[in-house]
């Protein structure tokens, strides 16, 4: 599985950062791989909640069934996803306080049969670019 984990400092409080991170309707505004939801968003999130969305990775769109695997407000939310063709996704968002506001951590994982061999290293590079761009967009949008 190709995975990258990076963080960025944002000049807003940890609670404000969490409020944006946990607002699923805002996810497409800053998370590069997220194109939109195809199911109703739940009124309340928690472990085990499932949501259907569309993800874009390496230029390919895929319908993904996401499941919340960790829900620890206001610190961490993690989701795993399964898409068509055996693709696997993982997204973990963390928020921690810093002296100047908060740090947003983003771990993005991409895997499945299609990503073995040379395509796997290309996927790792693409995932790193997506994580960097997502963190930058979050900071620009909300910071």
From Swiss-Prot:
One of its GO terms (cellular component) is plasma membrane. It comes from the Bacteria. It holds the Pfam family Polyketide_cyc2. This is Uncharacterized protein Rv1546. It comes from Mycobacterium tuberculosis (strain ATCC 25618 / H37Rv).
């Amino acid at each position: 599985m190709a995975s990258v984990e990076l963080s960025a400092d944002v000049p807003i409080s940890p609670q404000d950062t969490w409020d944006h991170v946990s607002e699923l309707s805002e996810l497409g505004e800053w998370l590069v791989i997220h194109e939109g939801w195809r199911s109703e968003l739940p009124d309340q999130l928690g472990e085990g909640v499932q949501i259907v969305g569309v993800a874009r990775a390496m230029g390919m769109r895929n319908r993904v069934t996401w499941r919340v695997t960790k829900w620890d407000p206001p610190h961490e939310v993690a989701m795993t996803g399964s898409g068509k063709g055996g693709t696997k996704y993982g997204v973990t968002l963390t928020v921690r306080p810093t002296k100047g506001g908060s740090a947003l951590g983003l771990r993005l994982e991409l895997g499945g049969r299609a990503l073995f061999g040379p395509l796997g290293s290309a996927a790792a590079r693409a995932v790193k670019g997506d994580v960097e761009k997502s963190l930058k967009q979050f900071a620009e949008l909300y910071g």
